[in-house]
């Protein structure tokens, strides 16, 4: 269900506002080892239970009529989109085989290739060295640690119409002294939903109910939170109708709060609800225009100038596409509503434009990102102007600053020395939209003692990132950032920051 309604090294909190500080969790090394062994044995038991199932060869009779059809490719494995894979391709004996395909495609009825069970695993090991989280101010942490994430899933397809998808997770953070809720969850359900697909009125209707990972658009303001150990899951109901170039999506979502006290103790956050409707039209190729309305409800939200129940009505318009080397993604968002006795009026604009020299060696892409989000210009005027970035993407701003009260200009150069390798170098300048509001650190925490301090300049950072897809199953990534702070952060007790991340991932 490629709805993409509601990334990245980030330290995203469970809810996005100036409140909800992270609470360190106590743990011992022997507890982590015991819980990880339990998770591993659970995954191994699931695989062993199904290992007796019929082999792929048993589907050859059902696939004999496929000889006149083109050979379909094996699904591409993406860690955040495992539920979208269609492994019925393995019902065709002409498709190239790999080890353990007998567990990747377990036919339930050889006469109906679309009825099957598929098992899968993700493993990600990430080393991080962070010289100054939160620029060394606001109880920031410095040090080095490992983020280790293990996921395993079962995907049951009952023909073309019914899907039952369940994914478990085991995440630990050895070496991290101060654990946040997104760092560790030793055994819990990441996704568990039922999906229904039906033809309707010349189009396709898709319904999905349960716990799931979802994203909005470019993931500026609502990402899957790929970087930390724990992705952002939602207990949600989704309806998706697609016909021709038109796509209409409705959603009601409650983000899942993670905790690590007992196995399977994550729960829906009933004090934070996001609902809305999106309409999208694809003109040709990748060119599209979309708009959505969303209602954001957060109880007991805290900002620098006001506390109360936050209610935002959100209107977002986005266009994206690519034509002859030129690509673009431009998005504008308006937020209105109330919090406590104050009204809310905030805006943001996000843009990324690039041009790729497709006929030049290494296919260099020259890109420019420009982003603006409002802050609160007058804390005493009974109107809150601070933009709420909802569930933002950490990588987008190098994971140091947040989107509220921001001006961000970032030129970048990306090259491809090999088809499976990309290298990106970027430098960015950041300013506050207004000095009356604070500097915000990721995801949207106000840095103490920065509101009202003269000087809009926040700092400049340089970033280098490399990605290498070694095989369809293995990938390697490297990321390095140096952030030179401005005067407002320095007066608040901050210092320049450095970050290095090295990541190895595996998907089966």
Outline where the language-model segments fall.
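Transmembrane beta-strands of outer-membrane beta-barrel pores
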Residues: 123-131, 168-174, 211-215, 243-245, ...
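Surface-exposed loop and membrane-interface regions of Gram-negative outer-membrane beta-barrel proteins
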Residues: 129-148, 156-204, 219-224, 261, ...
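N-terminal periplasmic/intermembrane-space "pro-region" immediately following the signal or transit peptide
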Residues: 2-6, 14-16, 20, 25, ...
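Signature for the C-terminal beta-barrel architecture of outer-membrane proteins
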Residues: 200-207, 220-379, 436, 449-453, ...
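Outer-membrane beta-barrel "beta-signal"
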Residues: 496-508
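Extracellular/periplasmic loop regions
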Residues: 73-82, 86-97, 304-305, 331, ...
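Short loop/turn motifs that connect adjacent beta-strands in outer-membrane beta-barrel proteins
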Residues: 96, 101-119, 155-161, 198-205, ...
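Membrane-embedded beta-strand positions of outer-membrane beta-barrel proteins
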Residues: 119-121, 166, 207-209, 239, ...
